[in-house]
Structure formats: C-alpha cells, structure tokens
C-alpha cells in the first residue's frame, strides 16, 4: 500500500511538472489525506528525499495557482478597459448625432417644410429670408401676401419691422448723398473764390464733422438692425413708425441740417468778431466763444461714445475756453475759482483736468450750484433795492445841486446804472464770502456805499450784527421743504438766523415745545453743516434762547422745555435807524466823518475811471456841491438830534448807543433793516461768518438741563 501511494504521488508530481491543471493537484492532496486517514504510519518508510520532493511539488502547484489567478485578473482588467472605451465611443457617437440633429433642425427651421404646420415655419421664414436677401416688398406683393393668408400675425409684424428698417436705410442713404453733394459744391465754390487758408481749415473741419456724423448714424443703424434681427427690438402697436425711433436717440435729418447751419453761422460770426477786437459787445463774445466750442467738440475723438454724440454742457464750456484761457470765469491768476476750491493750477490744461476730475457732475457739485443760485438770487434782490435807493439819492442830490450855490453843471451826467456799477466794484470786500460764494471777479454785488449814513463809527457791534442779519433771510417752512435733501447732505451754512431756525424746530414738533437737546438734535438732523463744530453753534443756540423774549422756558414733567411766543416774535421788527435819536446823537462830527467818506468815494470813483470823479476833475464844482450837500444833511441831522434829545424814550437812552445794542431793545430783521454800511466799516468787516456772531459781545448764559 505504501509503495502504491508513493507511486501515485510520483505520477501525480510528474503530471504537475508536465503542466497539468490545478485540479489534479487537489486530487493528489486528497489521496494523500485519504492514505493518512487510514490510520497507517506514512512517515516511517518515507525518506528525506521523498519529503523534499513532495515539498517541491507543493510549491510548484502554488506557483501555478498564483499564475492562473494573475492571468484571470489581467483578463478582467482588459475587459473593463474595453468596456470603457466602448462607452466613450458610444457617447461620442451620441453627441455627434445630437449635433447633426440640431444642424438639421436649424436648416429645416430656415426653410418652409410641408410636413409641419403653418405656424412654426411662419415665425422663422421672414427673419432668415431678410438676413439672406433683404429686399423691399412692393405694395402689390404685400397685398398678395395678405390675401393668401400664408403668414401669421407675428410673422407679419416681423416682416413689417424689416421693411421699415430697409426703408430707413434707403432714406439715410439718400440724405447722405445729398449732404455729400452739398459739401462738394461748397468746397468747389470756396476753391474757385480763392478764400483764405483759415476758411479752408473751417471747411475741412466742417467736412470732418459731416463724415463723423455719417459714421455715427451708420453705426447706430447697424446696431439697431442687428438688435431687430435678433428679436431684441420690437415695435408696439401704439408706438410710431420705426424710422423715427433710432433717430430719436440721435438726431433727425432736420436737426442735422439745423446743426449744420449753426456751425456755419458760428464760424462766420467768429470771422466777423475776430476783425473787431476793440468791440466789447457781450453778444459777439458769446457767439465767438460758442463757435470754437462746437468745432472742438466735433473734432475731439473722445467726444463720441458708443456711437452717440456727447453734448454735455460742462464739456462744451471747458472746450470752448481752450482757445480763450483768459476768459474762463472759473480760472484766474493760476487758481481754480470754483466756490470753496481755490486749488492752484500751473496752466490752463491743468485747470481743465482739475475741473473735469474734481468738479464733475455729482451730488457735491450740484449742491454747490444750488447754493450759488440762492446766493445770486439774494444778491440780485439786494442789488435792485440798492439801485432804487441810489436813484432816490441821485434825484435828491440833483435837486440840491439846482440851488444858487450849487454848480451850473447838473449831476445827471453820471447815470444811475454807471454809478451803481462803479460803486459796487469799489468795495469788493463787503461781499459776504460764504463757503460757497464764488471768488472769481464776477462784478461783486454789494450794498451800495452810503453817501449819507447814519451809523456811528464807534458802534461796531451793532453794525456787525446788522450785516449778519442782512444776509440771514427769514426762514419759512417752504424753504426748508424745497431744499431739505440739499441741506441734509451738503455742508453748507443755511442762510437763516439762529432765532428763525429755533422757531422752525419748535413749530415742527407735535407739541410745539422742545428741550434743549431736542433742538440740538433737530439742527444736526436737518443740516449737515451743524454736525461739526458742535460747541460753537450750540453756544449760539443757547444765547438766542436766553436773550430773545419770543422764546419762553416752561417747566414740565420732562424738565425745562422751550416754546415760541408768536406775538413777541412778530414784534421783532427794527425801527428805522434814522428815527432813533440816540444812535444819531452818537455820530461823529460832520467834518470828521465826511473826510474819510469823501476820500473813499473819490478813490472808488477814480479807480473806476469815471470822468466826473477823476483826479483831474476834482476841482469840478459838482463834486464840491456833492460834498456840501453831504455836510448839510449831516449838520441838519445833528441839529435835529440835539433839539429832540429830551424827547427820547427811556429805552433809547444815549447809554445804549455807547455799548453794543441789546437784541431785546432793537432786534433787527432782514426785511426792514436796509440801512447800508459805510465803506470804512465794510472794509474792516471780516467776510467770514462766525457761528455766534449775533451775540459775540454779550456774556454766555448756558442753560443746564
């Protein structure tokens, strides 16, 4: 039995060595196990060589099994890779099929397919046909299309839009041809006439202008047609025809012709004004300044953006002053004279760059323009009043000059307009320079210099307060409502008195009463100007509350609140200073006062080159009569004051004129306080407004709540 099992193992080992399968090896192992399970002792008769041989056979069998497993794994991996490649190829084929289907659909949508219904091709046919072969349809063809009823309403609308666009193109082409013919005729006429080189330059500029307009219109039409073809531009039933729509953004042919006429007339006006350099007519200078603005605007390559002509007014003004640097009202002596700017610019191009960058169209510049408009309106009103006053003074002095001791030459040689203009230019320091007041020499309009003044030179306190009240106009709810957003955003001092602002704050409250902190909050909420320098203006608010009789302090649950007594507020009307004997009594003597006034008047008239008051004509009897009339008026006022001194009321004692006038005694209101300032006083007056200017000479009374 042992020999048979050994022979079996040998035969099985040889079979494994010869490349037999792993199944035979398993059978061999099973046979060995069977022999061992029989209970016999197999290891007794086996030698060491047999055991080594058996071990080698087992190792060889394991190696063969491993090789088989590796081969199976490699085959599986190859199969997976092949499957992935097949899937990728299928996906690519599907994508190609989808693309082909899309192309076929696009081709089919462009053609009229009989298999589909009439609605689907009806929406696409006119657009594709118009893109391929745009042609104008005659009325007969349109009637045939309507009779056959082949097209749907949407398709008819698209077709009409395309036809209108084509008609517009034809109209533009005809207009362009006419314009080119006119240009050629004008060029031929100028060449035959043998005009100056300057006129030839103007003609070339005009030609370039026309070419640029044509290019702009063509680009605009192409853009609109592309939008229409893509379906982005449609026409509603209530809208006008298409030929007027694209030109509404730019210019219609009539506007182009009008602009062409303006350019030609402006250039001719420029030639006429250039020959008359000595003329000072304002209209001619305006025309000459507008002509280079248009030409430079057209020739500027940056003046057109996105095919549209930019006609912004500040740009035109800045370009118009490139050829006239000395005439720009916002530039002088190397400084930008925009209100509140005063930036130093080395030359005029630097100023233009600064003007376009710093003072562009934004909220801050708009707010400054609004404030400047208010300042100009107030100054115009003041100028009208001063002109009336000056006319009355001139009439009165003319009557005085007809007396026997006066000169035979009448005083009306100097017109009231000339005198008012020269007088206003004589004292530029009296112009109230707020942060938004222009610093350019634009003929500052001030209160006219008073020839017969009734203000004492020693009472500087009341004069300064009167000057401040003259500028601060009375407040009204309409003024705040109109400029509410402006005052909230712009750091501009409101042109109102503190008393008027406090009254407005109290009246706007629901209970018609406010605490001090609530008044502060109203100031900071309504005006951006009061959000800084709180200590200064809060001090002025406390002064006004404590010193005005119209503000009444009431104790309640909250503490101390302030209310307004309207009766007392309406009583705040100043009396004419000419009727106050206490103020007139404290004036200086007529000779001491008339000497500096006469000198200031002579200096102002001499600076303005008025023939009647020049240094050469100082010996004129008219000036002497004027001075004598001034002395007579002053002497009469002094005598009247001395005679009526005993009749003065206790509240108007002479002691009040020595000290600054208390507001409770004479609160001045801007509507009636029209007494003009003297030249000496206004020259010494600082133009900058202090926040507590109204009561700066009085003690501070702080209300602690």
UniProtKB/Swiss-Prot annotation:
Cited SUPFAM superfamilies: Winged helix' DNA-binding domain (SSF46785)
A Pfam match: FOXP-CC
Keyword Nucleotide-binding in record: no
Residues annotated with Phosphoserine modification: 113, 686
Modification Phosphothreonine, positions: 681
A GO CC term attached to the entry: nucleus
Annotated segments matching region CTBP1-binding: 410-414
Region annotated Disordered, chain positions: 1-41, 267-286, 291-326, 418-450, 639-705
Residues of the DNA-binding region: 493-583
Ranges of Polar residues composition bias in the record: 1-19, 276-286, 291-311, 418-431, 640-651
Chain positions of all zinc fingers (C2H2-type): 334-359
Oxidoreductase is among the record's keywords: no
Region of interest (Leucine-zipper), ranges: 376-397
SMART domains recorded: FH
GO molecular function: chromatin binding; DNA binding; DNA-binding transcription factor activity; DNA-binding transcription factor activity, RNA polymerase II-specific; DNA-binding transcription repressor activity, RNA polymerase II-specific; identical protein binding; RNA polymerase II cis-regulatory region sequence-specific DNA binding; transcription coregulator binding
Sequence position, cross-link Glycyl lysine isopeptide (Lys-Gly) (interchain with G-Cter in SUMO2): 315, 400, 405, 470
Composition bias, Basic and acidic residues: 314-326
Entry's localization field: Nucleus
Tissue specificity statement from the Swiss-Prot or TrEMBL entry: Isoform 5 is specifically expressed in embryonic stem cells. Highest expression in the lung, brain, and spleen. Lower expression in heart, skeletal muscle, kidney, small intestine (isoform 3 not present) and liver.
Low complexity bias locations: 432-446
GO terms classed as biological process: cardiac muscle cell differentiation; endothelial cell activation; heart development; immunoglobulin V(D)J recombination; innate vocalization behavior; lung development; lung secretory cell differentiation; macrophage activation
Subunit annotation: Forms homodimers and heterodimers with FOXP2 and FOXP4. Dimerization is required for DNA-binding. Self-associates. Interacts with CTBP1. Interacts with NCOR2 and AR. Interacts with FOXP2. Interacts with TBR1. Interacts with AURKA; this interaction facilitates the phosphorylation of FOXP1, which suppresses the expression of FBXL7. Interacts with ZMYM2.
Record note on domains: The leucine-zipper is required for dimerization and transcriptional repression.
Annotated protein name in UniProt: Forkhead box protein P1
Originating species: Mus musculus (Mouse)
Gene name linked to the record: Foxp1
